[in-house]
């Protein structure tokens, strides 16, 4: 669970407790202040559970600087055995989610990500799970 995120405000201690408590007795949970997935990948063989909007951002150049590219990030993920379980999301054409940006449902397959990133992903199909609530709406 991320305390910090490049696109969102920092979580409070109360928010962190509320997020990890339901998971704590069933799954190992890592709480981190790392803002990017490359920073979060300091351990090997981590599986991240993300929405289609998040994996789309991971595959975008604008989230990296001139010295570190999307391809560099994917190489780090691959070398460290990082995997992503990806849930589809209702997204606008700009890949935004939430109540004010309705669009169409996007799954891992419909995003057009680099194949090297897609190979690191496990897709959860819409028929298995769909919720159109954004994390912002849940908070």
Task: Indicate where each model-derived feature is located.
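Nucleotidyltransferase catalytic core that binds NTPs
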Residues: 1-139
